[in-house]
Regions:
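Aromatic "clamp/platform" in nucleotide-sugar-dependent glycosyltransferases that forms part
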Residues: 275
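A conserved mid-protein helix/loop that constitutes part of the nucleotide-sugar donor-binding site
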Residues: 13-24, 199-215
Length: 360
């Protein structure tokens, strides 16, 4: 059997992690009855006796190159290699092919309630209104759909009206080596941490607004740590200028290694105001470290933090709710409790076991 895996968008971040994890599972499966053909852009994966890797780096040059690849090159590859089944890790199916397709959907923008205007964010508007239509049509066309979370499954069913049995939830593999858990101390209960990129939907501004309000009502000492340099884009530059001008207790410490982020979960409180995520990985990571978490009240956070005693929620569009939570912690009106053992057991599964069962 010939199975072709498409993932030309993956070059970094979570998408690349999903690709690498899946490739490793395939490489370790040792099933000689399946020939795997990985179709990628720039990532380099090792070929084996039953794994072939096709790279098309020019796909990343522009949207036009990507559209040309999807509409003409991809279908030709399926026919050229006499593919029996396609596994698409890139949110959309391959057009103009007759073989069965399994679709992995991890782009949440077409399914969230928040709607971007073209003026607010051109790229996200395109994802929601143009690419989003393609993703929704692909969910309808694929024989099987895999998503990372229950909320995504529910949203897919609501938007596409497909049979819910067609969509399966398989959380991504999260390789965590937990070396320590959150410890309460004066330092940890007055340090807040937000590991996130500088995208606007990550909602750093809400934290600034909350800090500005706390400055008016409290003299308690605390600090907030961002994993930003302060010059990533115009949005982040504006955040940095606000912090400097108003002397808010926010530190721009720049990117941190995975190990450094894990260490921060043990000695600070995670603030997560993002309102557009599929999973919200820091939430899961903090929970694994038995951390103290303040999270936006959204479907993804409710799912990842379900039944977790040390998770508190706020409206991601109401800074006063976050202000109240931070102020309550600083005044010791909101306390950390020792979580039950085994809180996160069973959250993660391996993708490959389900995929192989679908493709035989």
């Amino acid at each position: 059997m010939n199975i072709m895996v498409f993932d030309v968008p993956a070059i970094n971040g979570g998408a690349l992690s999903v690709l690498n994890d899946f490739y490793n599972e395939v490489a370790e499966s040792n099933d000689k009855n399946i020939n795997w053909i990985f179709v990628l852009s720039t990532p380099t994966l090792k070929e084996t006796n039953n794994i072939k890797v096709l790279r098309f780096p020019w796909v990343k040059k522009s949207w036009g190159h990507r559209i040309y690849f999807d509409q003409f090159i991809a279908p030709k590859l399926v026919k050229q290699y006499q593919v029996d089944k396609v596994f698409s890790l890139q949110n959309v199916t391959i057009p103009h092919v007759k073989c069965k397709q399994i679709l992995y959907v991890h782009q949440s923008l077409p399914f969230v309630d928040y709607k971007f205007t073209f003026k607010d964010n051109k790229l996200f508007w395109v994802y929601q209104n143009i690419i989003g239509r393609n993703i929704i049509n692909s969910v309808k066309e694929a024989q099987r759909v895999i998503v990372q979370t229950e909320w995504m499954k529910k949203a897919c069913v609501e938007r596409t009206q497909v049979d819910s049995q067609k969509i399966e939830v398989i959380p991504p593999v999260i390789n965590l080596e937990v070396k320590g858990n959150f410890k309460t101390s004066d330092g940890s209960l007055s340090t807040f941490f937000y590991p996130a990129s500088g995208a606007e939907y990550k909602n750093h501004q809400l934290i600034l607004d909350a800090c500005r309000e706390i400055k008016k009502i409290s003299e308690k000492k605390y600090k907030v740590i961002f994993t930003l340099n302060g010059n990533e884009n115009s949005y982040v530059s504006d955040l940095y200028k606000q912090v400097q001008k108003e002397q808010l207790p926010i530190c721009f410490e720049g990117p941190k290694t995975r190990e450094e982020v894990f260490d921060m979960y043990t000695k600070s409180i995670l603030i997560f105001p993002s309102y557009i995520e599929t999973l919200g990985l820091p939430l899961l990571e903090a929970r694994e470290h038995k951390g103290f978490v303040l999270a936006s009240n959204c479907p993804f956070s409710n799912e990842v933090l379900r039944n977790y005693e040390n998770a508190y929620y706020f409206d991601p569009f109401n800074f006063r709710e976050l202000t109240t939570l931070i102020d309550s912690i600083l005044k010791k009106n909101l306390s950390y409790v020792s979580p039950r053992i085994d809180d996160t057991k069973g959250i993660n599964q391996h993708l490959i076991s389900k995929v192989l069962s679908e493709v035989r």
